[in-house]
């Protein structure tokens, strides 16, 4: 009699799945963590809700209303979830039939679009960006048949640039009546003028992902948002867990989204942008750095001579960067989160010492 292992019982697509390599999963024993695009220092909050004996609201009113006001949309156009990552998955679960429909995304970009689709058993199609990392609209048009959700990250992670707004409009026209277009705006606080939130009334098939993990300095909270028209939100509400946000998470999120919380966030953004420009200028003068790319975010992508050796050398010194070599068109590239001035100086000094 053949022995069936536990792994044999698992779904085939799960057996074949490569999990997303998050910064924490990749590990390292560093003291300068510049690999996850987090804010470099902790922001303090006091819990005000002492009702942990009760289940939380599914969509906490204060969080939804505060975020709607901040984003300039109606409360019924907002869904809150466990990070934007849950929003990515909810959109696939609501709109894609496993084994029939597909998602489409444009590498090099964020890795969770493919992981979420593959976990659910939904086909992934890719249309690599052009040499300038802008959308290949003809390539997308050629592959749209059977696609239900298109993910576009803007500013794009890991390249750091904004997608041309006219290309977004063309994409939204191409997909009208066919697919949901998801603009992943995880880093939009660093370039708020580029948000598509004002386009929701014009495009019923547009959804926007947001997070408190970056400019709001709350990566450990796991709190994200989907902005979309009410019809889309109602469908997502059918597939979301009954209690996606714990009471402490909702409590802190509401405080972070208060008027004073928004002011504090904008002060952090100003500080990070100034530090980003300092680091970009310094990187351009370092011999082992071949190219530094413009950034609209809190991280910098740069191409290095002997990038793998540079990555390991800094890793061994406790400076943890993000290796992008395996991403399409990013050979030799490392991504550096913008941290404190002290952290920037550690990176600069370590890179200057590299022998190339």
From Swiss-Prot:
Coiled coil: none annotated. GO terms for biological process: L-histidine biosynthetic process. Keywords: Amino-acid biosynthesis, Aminotransferase, Histidine biosynthesis, Pyridoxal phosphate, Transferase. Gene3D superfamilies: Aspartate Aminotransferase, domain 1, Type I PLP-dependent aspartate aminotransferase-like (Major domain). It holds the Pfam family Aminotran_1_2. Its cofactor is pyridoxal 5'-phosphate. SUPFAM superfamilies: PLP-dependent transferases (SSF53383). Pathway: Amino-acid biosynthesis; L-histidine biosynthesis; L-histidine from 5-phospho-alpha-D-ribose 1-diphosphate: step 7/9. It catalyses: L-histidinol phosphate + 2-oxoglutarate = 3-(imidazol-4-yl)-2-oxopropyl phosphate + L-glutamate. InterPro entries: Aminotrans_II_pyridoxalP_BS, Aminotransferase_I/II_large, HisP_aminotrans, PyrdxlP-dep_Trfase, PyrdxlP-dep_Trfase_major, PyrdxlP-dep_Trfase_small. It is an enzyme of class 2 (transferase). HAMAP family: HisC_aminotrans_2. PANTHER family: HISTIDINOL-PHOSPHATE AMINOTRANSFERASE (PTHR42885:SF2), HISTIDINOL-PHOSPHATE AMINOTRANSFERASE-RELATED (PTHR42885). Homodimer. Belongs to the class-II pyridoxal-phosphate-dependent aminotransferase family. Histidinol-phosphate aminotransferase subfamily. This is Histidinol-phosphate aminotransferase. It comes from Shigella sonnei (strain Ss046).
């Amino acid at each position: 009699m053949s022995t069936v292992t536990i792994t044999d019982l698992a779904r085939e697509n799960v057996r074949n799945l490569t999990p997303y390599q998050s910064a924490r999963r990749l590990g390292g024993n560093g003291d300068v963590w510049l690999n996850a695009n987090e804010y470099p220092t902790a922001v303090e909050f006091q819990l005000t809700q002492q009702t942990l004996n009760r289940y939380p609201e599914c969509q906490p009113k204060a969080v939804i209303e505060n975020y709607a006001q901040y984003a300039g949309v109606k409360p019924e156009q907002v869904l809150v979830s466990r990070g934007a990552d849950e929003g990515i998955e909810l959109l696939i679960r609501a709109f894609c039939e496993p084994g029939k429909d597909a998602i489409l995304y444009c590498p090099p970009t964020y890795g969770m679009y493919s992981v979420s689709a593959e976990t659910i058993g939904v086909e992934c199609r890719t249309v690599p960006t052009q040499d300038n990392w802008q959308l290949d609209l003809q390539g997308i048009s050629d592959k749209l048949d059977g696609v239900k959700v298109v993910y576009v990250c803007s500013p794009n992670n890991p390249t750091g640039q904004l997608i041309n707004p006219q290309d977004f409009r063309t994409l939204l026209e191409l997909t009208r009546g066919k697919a949901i277009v998801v603009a992943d705006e995880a880093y939009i606080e660093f370039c708020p003028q580029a948000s598509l939130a004002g386009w929701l009334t014009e495009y019923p098939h547009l959804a926007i992902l947001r997070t408190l993990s970056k400019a709001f300095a709350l990566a450990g909270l796991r709190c994200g948002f989907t902005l979309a028209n009410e019809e889309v939100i109602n469908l997502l509400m059918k597939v979301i867990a009954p209690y996606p946000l714990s009471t402490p998470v909702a409590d802190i999120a509401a405080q972070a989204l208060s008027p004073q919380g928004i002011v504090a966030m904008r002060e952090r953004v100003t500080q990070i942008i100034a530090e980003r420009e300092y680091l970009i200028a310094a990187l351009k003068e370092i011999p082992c750095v071949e190219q530094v790319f413009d950034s609209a975010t809190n991280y910098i992508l740069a191409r290095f001579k002997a990038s793998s050796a540079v990555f390991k050398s800094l890793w061994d010194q406790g400076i943890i960067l993000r290796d992008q070599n395996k991403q399409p068109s990013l050979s030799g590239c490392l991504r550096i989160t913008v941290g404190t001035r002290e952290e920037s100086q550690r990176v600069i000094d370590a890179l200057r010492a590299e022998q190339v």
